[in-house]
A protein has these predicted regions:
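Domain-level signature for soluble enzymes in the chorismate/prephenate branch of the shikimate pathway
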Residues: 1-286
Length: 286
C-alpha cells in the first residue's frame, strides 16, 4: 500500500471521528430542545423547520456527494432523534396490489421509527384520530373517486388531524412523481405550519350542482392558485361532492379567505376549511 493511500485513509478515519463527535453533540442539543418544548407545551415535530433545514443544506452543498444522499442522511438523523424524544410511531396503508408507500415512508421517517402496515385507509386515519399512532401514510388523492380517505379530515371537532407532508421527500423531484401511485401524504395531529414555500389543501363540501370549473374559477377570483382539484362522491351524501383543493402557498386555518369562500358558495357550501398541506423540498433531478 502506498504511503499516500495510507495517509488518505488516516485522514478519513479522523474525519469519521469528528463527524461522530458532532453527531453526538447534535443529539444532545436536540434532546435539550425537546425538554424545553415539553416544559413549554410546544409542538415536538416541526416539518416546516425540517424543510427549511434541508433547503439550507442543499443550497450550500457542492462536491461529489449526491444531493439525494444529503437529504437521506439528515432525514435519518431527524427520525432517530425524534424517536428518542417522543416515541413516534407510523402506520402505512397497504393493499393487495402491494405497498409503494412503504419505501417512501421509510426514507422520510428513517430506519429507527417503528412502522407497521394497515390495509384500510379509514383505519389508518382512525389510528391517528384515536392516538394509536403518530402518523399515517396514505395514498395520494385521485382526481375523481368514491369515499376518499381525506373526507375524514373535514369538519373535525376535537381531533385536529391534518395533512402534514408529501412523499417522496426530495427523492427525485416532482417531474418523476406525477403518477399518484408513486406519491403519498402524511396525516398527523401535529399542526401544519408555514415554511415559506408550501402548498395548502383546502377542503370543500359543495352541492353537486356546483361544477369543478366553477370551483376553480371562484378560487382564482380570490387569488388562489390551484395546483390540482380532487373530488369524491359518497352514496351516503348523494347531494354533495367533496373537493380537495391543492393550492400554491400557505393558507392559515383562520384566513379571511375561508369566510369569503363560504359567502361565495353560500347555501351550496356545507364545509370549507384548511385540512393541511406540505412544505416544498428543492428538486433533486439533475
Amino acid at each position: 500500500m502506498s504511503k499516500t493511500l495510507s495517509d488518505i485513509r488516516v485522514k478519513i478515519d479522523k474525519i469519521d471521528d469528528k463527524v461522530h463527535d458532532l453527531l453526538m453533540e447534535r443529539a444532545s442539543l436536540v434532546s435539550s430542545i425537546a425538554e424545553a418544548k415539553r416544559k413549554s407545551n410546544l409542538q415536538m415535530v416541526q416539518p416546516a423547520r425540517e424543510a427549511k433545514m434541508i433547503r439550507r443544506l442543499l443550497a450550500r452543498h457542492n462536491g461529489p456527494l449526491p444531493r439525494q444522499a444529503v437529504v437521506r442522511i439528515w432525514r435519518e438523523l431527524v427520525g432517530a432523534v425524534a424517536l428518542l424524544q417522543t416515541g413516534l410511531t407510523v402506520v402505512v396503508f397497504a393493499d393487495e396490489h402491494g405497498n409503494p408507500h412503504w419505501d417512501m415512508a421509510k426514507d422520510y421517517f428513517g430506519s429507527i421509527v417503528p412502522m407497521k402496515k394497515i390495509n384500510s385507509r379509514a383505519g389508518a386515519v382512525g389510528a391517528v384520530r384515536n392516538d394509536e399512532t403518530s402518523f399515517a401514510v396514505l395514498p395520494w388523492p385521485e382526481l375523481d373517486q368514491n369515499d376518499a380517505w381525506w373526507v375524514h379530515l373535514f369538519d373535525q371537532h376535537s381531533e385536529k388531524m391534518s395533512i402534514l407532508c408529501a412523499l417522496p421527500y426530495g427523492s427525485h423531484g416532482r417531474k418523476s412523481t406525477q403518477n399518484p401511485t408513486h406519491r403519498s401524504l402524511v396525516v398527523s395531529k401535529f399542526e401544519f405550519l408555514p415554511s415559506d414555500d408550501d402548498c395548502t389543501f383546502l377542503g370543500l363540501d359543495l352541492r353537486v350542482s356546483v361544477s369543478r370549473t366553477r370551483v376553480v374559477d371562484r378560487l382564482a377570483e380570490h387569488g388562489v392558485t390551484v395546483v390540482n382539484l380532487y373530488s369524491s362522491k359518497s352514496s351516503a351524501r348523494p347531494d354533495y361532492n367533496a373537493h380537495l383543493v391543492e393550492a400554491r402557498g400557505y393558507i392559515a386555518p383562520d384566513s379571511p379567505l375561508l369566510d369569503a369562500l363560504r359567502q361565495v358558495f353560500d347555501a351550496d357550501c356545507r364545509y370549507c376549511g384548511v385540512v393541511g398541506g406540505y412544505p416544498a423540498v428543492p428538486e433533486l433531478d439533475e
